[in-house]
Design a protein with these regions (language model features):
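Catalytic phosphate/metal-binding cores of nucleic-acid and nucleotide-processing enzymes, i.e., regions
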Residues: 1-94
Length: 94
């Protein structure tokens, strides 16, 4: 499965929860996660998407750590099963 299909799947699942999964590409900053997921209740999750079996690059790991240090949740998904698990956990928590 291509990364773009995983990304589209994430977007659809988040929208079914009543949220938004915006493409996130701040000007002049490289290595940030692909999507900023905004959920009802003010929840924010930054998501890096990868093709199956691929890992985040060093700079992407660094940016993820920066966001985590600020208190944000950051996830990296390389398959739809991980997205389904996230959505299930969100539904259970609500």
């Amino acid at each position: 499965m291509e990364e773009s299909r995983i990304e589209n799947y994430l977007k659809r699942r988040v929208e079914k929860l009543g949220g938004k999964a915006y493409k996130w590409a701040p000007v002049g900053v490289v290595g940030v996660p692909d999507r900023m997921v905004l959920l009802p209740g003010g929840k924010v999750i930054f998501v890096e998407l990868k093709a199956p079996g691929k890992k985040a690059r060093k700079l992407q790991e660094y940016r993820a750590k920066q966001l985590k240090d600020l208190g944000f949740r950051v996830e990296c998904f390389d398959n739809i099963e991980k997205i389904d698990k996230l959505v299930s956990n969100i539904e259970i928590a609500d």
